């Protein structure tokens, strides 16, 4: 009789399903025999223009050092981040993407406590908290956004952490500064608030200064990533800023060398250069063109402050998604976020957006 390895897992893991990523281009090419060059991917909120050329130069210069382990402390990158935001290096925690930070927080909370977050929120929150043995306490959304008053009511003596994505993924809603400050003022100091700002640069630009909240709220942790606007999704590097004590706790469970050497070099170079996508508002025109095209198709979408739109098709989105895939267009169905009639569409180049809109028009007419 073979062993039941699922039974060996903790109860929270037994109830989980693996995280489903945006379908890779190579995978669709294999499945349907489509030439990769014909495939348009607007599924993972990536930067379609790629990183700054200086980043590529820095990575090439590091290739000869691949035989060496990276700096496990991430000293240079932490120093650059600290200088940029007027913090101390001991307030910075580095992660293998910002979802690594979310996982570190959940692991520190462990079994027993509960984590509060909104419906339609990033899937990493329930995955990480349940895997750690914590209870996921999901608060119903208001207009697909965070119900901050509802979150406050959900807090009890067992609440360890609140996760707030701002802007939210996959809906794109944003909590304004005044509402956020009022919320933070009312959260008990014993409860950690994780402000997940993976997409904040698309709203405030790369000069966003939300990190100054750390002075007022010692129970706040702000997480960000270089995967989105900086175009480093393939290298996986994120960071958080918090009080030194919170950072110390996270570093106790952080895996050795969790950020690889190429990612560290690229992040240092990328952080000191401006995003070519945001420069001059270069991503605004594609957003407008995509919205105009959706309006011509008489479709509705949730107003977004990220580099994506959650589009309501008014019917089951799965067949529409399948039709788009057959035409070589990859977007993201979000039925798993309790949005079965929606597709999340990343903002691409003008050509990519036009290709998506034409494919969508054809599928809707079938």
Curated annotation (Swiss-Prot):
The modification N6-(pyridoxal phosphate)lysine is found at residue 228. Pathway: Amino-acid biosynthesis; L-histidine biosynthesis; L-histidine from 5-phospho-alpha-D-ribose 1-diphosphate: step 7/9. Its cofactor is pyridoxal 5'-phosphate. GO terms for molecular function: histidinol-phosphate transaminase activity; pyridoxal phosphate binding. GO terms for biological process: L-histidine biosynthetic process. Its EC number is 2.6.1.9. It catalyses: L-histidinol phosphate + 2-oxoglutarate = 3-(imidazol-4-yl)-2-oxopropyl phosphate + L-glutamate. The keyword tRNA processing does not apply. Disulfide bonds: none annotated. InterPro entries: Aminotransferase_I/II_large (IPR004839), HisP_aminotrans (IPR005861), HistidinolP_aminotransfase (IPR050106), PyrdxlP-dep_Trfase (IPR015424), PyrdxlP-dep_Trfase_major (IPR015421), PyrdxlP-dep_Trfase_small (IPR015422). Keywords: Amino-acid biosynthesis, Aminotransferase, Histidine biosynthesis, Pyridoxal phosphate, Transferase. Homodimer. Belongs to the class-II pyridoxal-phosphate-dependent aminotransferase family. Histidinol-phosphate aminotransferase subfamily. This is Histidinol-phosphate aminotransferase. It comes from Stutzerimonas stutzeri (Pseudomonas stutzeri). The lineage of its organism: Bacteria, Pseudomonadati, Pseudomonadota, Gammaproteobacteria, Pseudomonadales.
């Amino acid at each position: 009789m073979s062993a039941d390895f699922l039974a060996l897992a903790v109860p929270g893991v037994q109830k989980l399903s693996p995280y489903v990523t945006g379908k890779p281009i190579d995978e669709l090419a294999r499945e349907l025999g489509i030439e990769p060059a014909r495939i348009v991917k607007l599924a993972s909120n990536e930067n379609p223009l790629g990183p700054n050329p200086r980043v590529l130069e820095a990575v090439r210069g590091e290739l000869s050092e691949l035989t060496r382990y990276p700096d496990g402390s991430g000293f240079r990158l932490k120093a650059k981040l600290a200088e940029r935001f007027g913090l101390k290096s001991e307030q910075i925690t580095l992660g293998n993407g910002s979802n690594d930070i979310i996982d570190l927080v959940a692991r520190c909370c462990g079994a027993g406590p509960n984590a509060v977050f909104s419906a339609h929120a990033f899937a990493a929150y329930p995955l990480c908290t349940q895997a750690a043995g914590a209870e996921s306490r999901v608060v119903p959304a208001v207009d697909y956004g965070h119900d901050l008053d509802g979150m406050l009511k959900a807090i009890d003596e067992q609440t360890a952490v609140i996760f707030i994505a701002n802007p939210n993924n996959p809906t794109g809603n944003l909590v304004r500064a005044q509402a956020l400050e009022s919320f933070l003022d009312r959260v008990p100091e014993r409860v950690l608030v994780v402000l997940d700002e993976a997409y904040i640069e698309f709203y405030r630009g790369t000069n966003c200064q939300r990190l100054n909240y750390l002075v007022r709220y010692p129970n706040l942790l702000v997480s960000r990533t270089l995967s989105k606007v900086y175009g480093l999704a393939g290298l996986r590097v994120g960071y958080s800023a918090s009080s030194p004590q919170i950072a110390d706790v996270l570093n106790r469970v952080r895996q050795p060398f969790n950020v690889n050497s190429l990612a560290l070099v690229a992040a240092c170079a990328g952080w000191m250069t401006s995003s070519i996508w945001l420069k001059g508002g270069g991503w605004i025109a594609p957003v407008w063109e995509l919205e105009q095209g959706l309006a011509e198709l008489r479709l509705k979408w949730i107003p977004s402050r990220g580099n994506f739109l959650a589009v309501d098709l008014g019917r089951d989105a799965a067949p529409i998604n399948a039709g788009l895939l057959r035409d070589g267009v990859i977007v993201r169905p979000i039925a798993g976020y309790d949005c079965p009639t929606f597709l999340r569409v990343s903002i691409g180049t003008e050509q990519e957006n036009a290709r998506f809109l034409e494919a969508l028009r054809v599928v809707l007419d079938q």
